[in-house]
Protein backbone atom coordinates (compact mmCIF):
# COMPACT_ATOMS: atom_id res chain seq x y z
CA UNK A 1 0.00 0.00 0.00
CA UNK A 2 1.50 3.25 -1.06
CA UNK A 3 0.40 6.70 0.03
CA UNK A 4 0.94 9.44 -2.50
CA UNK A 5 0.46 13.14 -2.15
CA UNK A 6 -0.52 15.09 -5.24
CA UNK A 7 -3.10 17.24 -7.02
CA UNK A 8 -6.71 16.08 -7.30
CA UNK A 9 -6.93 17.05 -10.97
CA UNK A 10 -5.65 14.93 -13.81
CA UNK A 11 -2.95 15.86 -16.27
CA UNK A 12 -5.40 16.20 -19.13
CA UNK A 13 -7.41 19.01 -17.51
CA UNK A 14 -6.54 22.58 -18.17
CA UNK A 15 -4.21 24.15 -15.72
CA UNK A 16 -6.25 27.29 -15.50
CA UNK A 17 -10.02 26.94 -15.80
CA UNK A 18 -11.93 30.06 -14.81
CA UNK A 19 -15.58 30.29 -14.05
CA UNK A 20 -17.92 33.26 -14.60
CA UNK A 21 -16.59 34.99 -11.48
CA UNK A 22 -13.05 35.12 -12.80
CA UNK A 23 -11.60 32.80 -10.15
CA UNK A 24 -9.37 29.95 -11.31
CA UNK A 25 -10.26 26.36 -10.54
CA UNK A 26 -6.90 25.80 -8.85
CA UNK A 27 -7.75 28.53 -6.33
CA UNK A 28 -10.94 26.74 -5.39
CA UNK A 29 -9.39 23.26 -5.19
CA UNK A 30 -7.38 21.98 -2.33
CA UNK A 31 -3.68 22.05 -3.05
CA UNK A 32 -3.03 18.67 -1.36
CA UNK A 33 -4.84 15.36 -1.68
CA UNK A 34 -4.31 11.76 -0.58
CA UNK A 35 -4.03 8.89 -3.07
CA UNK A 36 -4.04 5.22 -2.12
CA UNK A 37 -2.50 2.72 -4.52
CA UNK A 38 -3.38 -0.98 -4.22
CA UNK A 39 -0.57 -3.37 -5.13
CA UNK A 40 -2.63 -6.52 -4.84
CA UNK A 41 -2.26 -7.33 -8.53
CA UNK A 42 -4.84 -5.04 -10.16
CA UNK A 43 -2.18 -3.03 -11.88
CA UNK A 44 -2.14 -0.13 -9.46
CA UNK A 45 -5.70 1.11 -9.40
CA UNK A 46 -5.80 4.48 -7.63
CA UNK A 47 -8.50 5.91 -5.47
CA UNK A 48 -8.38 9.68 -5.14
CA UNK A 49 -9.75 11.48 -2.16
CA UNK A 50 -10.07 15.25 -2.63
CA UNK A 51 -10.92 17.78 0.00
CA UNK A 52 -12.12 21.25 -0.76
CA UNK A 53 -12.00 24.18 1.53
CA UNK A 54 -14.44 27.02 1.78
CA UNK A 55 -13.97 29.98 -0.47
CA UNK A 56 -14.14 32.50 2.36
CA UNK A 57 -10.45 32.31 3.17
CA UNK A 58 -9.34 32.69 -0.46
CA UNK A 59 -10.47 36.13 -1.68
CA UNK A 60 -9.33 38.16 -4.61
CA UNK A 61 -7.25 41.32 -3.97
CA UNK A 62 -10.04 43.47 -5.40
CA UNK A 63 -12.57 42.19 -2.86
CA UNK A 64 -10.13 42.69 0.00
CA UNK A 65 -9.39 46.26 -1.12
CA UNK A 66 -13.14 46.97 -1.39
CA UNK A 67 -13.76 45.72 2.13
CA UNK A 68 -10.90 47.81 3.54
CA UNK A 69 -12.09 50.91 1.70
CA UNK A 70 -15.63 50.40 2.99
CA UNK A 71 -14.31 50.24 6.55
CA UNK A 72 -12.40 53.50 6.04
CA UNK A 73 -15.45 55.20 4.55
CA UNK A 74 -17.66 54.16 7.44
CA UNK A 75 -15.21 55.59 9.96
CA UNK A 76 -14.99 58.85 8.01
CA UNK A 77 -18.78 59.08 7.85
CA UNK A 78 -19.01 58.59 11.60
CA UNK A 79 -16.47 61.37 12.20
CA UNK A 80 -18.38 63.72 9.88
CA UNK A 81 -21.64 62.98 11.69
CA UNK A 82 -20.01 63.72 15.04
CA UNK A 83 -18.65 67.03 13.70
CA UNK A 84 -22.07 67.97 12.32
CA UNK A 85 -23.68 67.24 15.68
CA UNK A 86 -21.10 69.39 17.49
CA UNK A 87 -21.59 72.28 15.04
CA UNK A 88 -25.37 72.07 15.35
CA UNK A 89 -25.12 72.15 19.16
CA UNK A 90 -22.87 75.21 19.03
CA UNK A 91 -25.21 76.97 16.63
CA UNK A 92 -28.15 76.24 18.87
CA UNK A 93 -26.44 77.72 21.92
CA UNK A 94 -25.29 80.79 19.97
CA UNK A 95 -28.75 81.39 18.54
CA UNK A 96 -30.37 81.18 21.96
CA UNK A 97 -27.74 83.51 23.46
CA UNK A 98 -28.11 86.08 20.65
CA UNK A 99 -31.90 86.06 20.90
CA UNK A 100 -31.80 86.60 24.67
CA UNK A 101 -29.21 89.35 24.23
CA UNK A 102 -31.33 91.15 21.63
CA UNK A 103 -34.35 91.00 23.90
CA UNK A 104 -32.38 92.52 26.78
CA UNK A 105 -30.94 95.41 24.75
CA UNK A 106 -32.66 98.80 25.23
CA UNK A 107 -32.71 99.39 21.46
CA UNK A 108 -34.67 96.19 20.96
CA UNK A 109 -37.08 97.03 23.75
CA UNK A 110 -37.53 100.60 22.51
CA UNK A 111 -38.66 99.59 19.03
CA UNK A 112 -42.34 99.53 18.31
CA UNK A 113 -44.12 96.30 17.43
CA UNK A 114 -45.42 98.06 14.33
CA UNK A 115 -42.12 97.39 12.53
CA UNK A 116 -41.82 93.69 13.46
CA UNK A 117 -41.55 91.52 10.36
CA UNK A 118 -41.57 94.48 7.96
CA UNK A 119 -37.86 94.75 7.22
CA UNK A 120 -37.16 94.53 3.49
CA UNK A 121 -34.18 94.90 1.17
CA UNK A 122 -34.49 96.75 -2.11
CA UNK A 123 -32.18 96.78 -5.09
CA UNK A 124 -33.85 99.83 -6.58
CA UNK A 125 -34.25 103.05 -4.60
CA UNK A 126 -37.40 103.97 -6.51
CA UNK A 127 -39.16 100.92 -5.12
CA UNK A 128 -37.96 101.73 -1.62
CA UNK A 129 -39.28 105.30 -1.87
CA UNK A 130 -42.66 104.11 -3.09
CA UNK A 131 -43.05 101.47 -0.36
CA UNK A 132 -41.69 103.59 2.48
CA UNK A 133 -45.11 105.17 2.95
CA UNK A 134 -46.57 101.79 3.80
CA UNK A 135 -44.09 101.39 6.66
CA UNK A 136 -44.96 104.74 8.21
CA UNK A 137 -46.53 104.43 11.62
CA UNK A 138 -49.63 106.47 12.33
CA UNK A 139 -49.12 108.53 15.48
CA UNK A 140 -51.53 108.00 18.30
CA UNK A 141 -53.26 111.31 19.19
CA UNK A 142 -53.33 110.37 22.87
CA UNK A 143 -49.53 110.02 22.99
CA UNK A 144 -49.07 113.28 21.11
CA UNK A 145 -51.31 115.15 23.56
CA UNK A 146 -49.46 113.59 26.48
CA UNK A 147 -46.11 114.78 25.17
CA UNK A 148 -47.44 118.30 24.66
CA UNK A 149 -48.81 118.45 28.20
CA UNK A 150 -45.48 117.34 29.67
CA UNK A 151 -43.59 119.92 27.59
CA UNK A 152 -45.93 122.73 28.74
CA UNK A 153 -45.52 121.74 32.38
CA UNK A 154 -41.75 121.84 32.11
CA UNK A 155 -41.90 125.20 30.39
CA UNK A 156 -44.10 126.73 33.09
CA UNK A 157 -41.91 125.32 35.83
CA UNK A 158 -38.85 126.84 34.16
CA UNK A 159 -40.49 130.23 34.08
CA UNK A 160 -41.64 130.18 37.69
CA UNK A 161 -38.41 128.87 39.13
CA UNK A 162 -34.95 130.35 38.76
CA UNK A 163 -32.08 128.43 37.28
CA UNK A 164 -30.36 127.96 40.63
CA UNK A 165 -33.50 126.43 42.20
CA UNK A 166 -34.50 124.36 39.19
CA UNK A 167 -31.18 122.50 39.15
CA UNK A 168 -30.67 121.17 42.65
CA UNK A 169 -27.35 121.45 44.46
CA UNK A 170 -27.66 117.91 45.78
CA UNK A 171 -27.53 116.39 42.31
CA UNK A 172 -24.17 117.32 40.72
CA UNK A 173 -25.07 115.55 37.47
CA UNK A 174 -27.97 117.91 36.79
CA UNK A 175 -26.73 120.82 34.73
CA UNK A 176 -28.33 123.06 32.13
CA UNK A 177 -27.52 122.57 28.49
CA UNK A 178 -26.95 126.31 28.09
CA UNK A 179 -26.02 129.03 30.56
CA UNK A 180 -29.27 130.64 31.67
CA UNK A 181 -29.53 134.28 32.55
CA UNK A 182 -32.49 136.09 34.06
CA UNK A 183 -32.24 139.82 33.53
CA UNK A 184 -33.70 142.01 36.23
CA UNK A 185 -35.63 144.97 34.83
CA UNK A 186 -35.45 147.02 38.06
CA UNK A 187 -31.66 146.80 38.20
CA UNK A 188 -31.49 147.72 34.54
CA UNK A 189 -33.57 150.91 35.09
CA UNK A 190 -31.52 151.88 38.14
CA UNK A 191 -28.27 151.51 36.22
CA UNK A 192 -29.64 153.56 33.35
CA UNK A 193 -30.64 156.38 35.73
CA UNK A 194 -27.24 156.35 37.37
CA UNK A 195 -25.57 156.43 33.98
CA UNK A 196 -27.59 159.51 32.93
CA UNK A 197 -26.80 161.32 36.18
CA UNK A 198 -23.09 160.57 36.20
CA UNK A 199 -21.96 161.40 32.69
CA UNK A 200 -18.57 162.55 33.91
CA UNK A 201 -17.74 159.27 35.61
CA UNK A 202 -18.21 157.07 32.53
CA UNK A 203 -15.20 154.86 33.07
CA UNK A 204 -16.05 154.01 36.66
CA UNK A 205 -19.62 153.25 35.73
CA UNK A 206 -18.55 150.88 32.97
CA UNK A 207 -16.33 148.97 35.36
CA UNK A 208 -19.16 148.68 37.87
CA UNK A 209 -21.48 147.41 35.13
CA UNK A 210 -18.98 144.79 34.07
CA UNK A 211 -18.55 143.60 37.64
CA UNK A 212 -22.31 143.38 38.14
CA UNK A 213 -22.67 141.40 34.93
CA UNK A 214 -19.96 138.95 35.95
CA UNK A 215 -21.56 138.43 39.35
CA UNK A 216 -24.93 137.71 37.74
CA UNK A 217 -23.38 135.13 35.47
CA UNK A 218 -21.71 133.45 38.42
CA UNK A 219 -24.96 133.35 40.38
CA UNK A 220 -26.85 131.89 37.41
CA UNK A 221 -24.36 129.06 36.97
CA UNK A 222 -24.71 125.95 39.09
CA UNK A 223 -22.01 124.05 40.90
CA UNK A 224 -21.88 121.34 38.20
CA UNK A 225 -21.25 123.82 35.38
CA UNK A 226 -18.92 126.08 37.35
CA UNK A 227 -15.82 126.53 35.16
CA UNK A 228 -12.34 128.00 35.65
CA UNK A 229 -12.83 130.71 33.04
CA UNK A 230 -15.36 132.47 35.27
CA UNK A 231 -12.88 132.45 38.16
CA UNK A 232 -10.18 133.90 35.95
CA UNK A 233 -12.50 136.69 34.85
CA UNK A 234 -13.34 137.48 38.47
CA UNK A 235 -9.65 137.57 39.39
CA UNK A 236 -8.94 139.91 36.49
CA UNK A 237 -11.70 142.24 37.65
CA UNK A 238 -10.35 142.31 41.20
CA UNK A 239 -6.86 143.03 39.89
CA UNK A 240 -8.10 146.00 37.89
CA UNK A 241 -9.82 147.40 40.97
CA UNK A 242 -6.63 147.14 43.01
CA UNK A 243 -4.65 148.94 40.34
CA UNK A 244 -7.18 151.76 40.21
CA UNK A 245 -7.00 152.21 43.96
UniProtKB/Swiss-Prot annotation:
Region spans: Kinase-inducible domain (KID): 203-230
Function comment: Probable transcription factor. Promotes slightly the tolerance to cadmium (Cd) and to oxidizing chemicals (e.g. diamide).
Subcellular location: Nucleus
Biological process (GO), any one: response to oxidative stress
Motif range (Nuclear localization signal): 143-151
Protein's UniProt name: Protein OXIDATIVE STRESS 3 LIKE 6
GO cellular component: nucleus
Region entry Disordered, spans: 46-90
InterPro entries: OxStress_Response_Reg
Superkingdom of source: Eukaryota
Main localization of the protein described in the UniProt heading: nucleus
Keyword Transcription: yes
Keywords: Nucleus, Stress response, Transcription, Transcription regulation
Acidic residues bias spans: 75-86
Lineage: Eukaryota, Viridiplantae, Streptophyta, Embryophyta, Tracheophyta
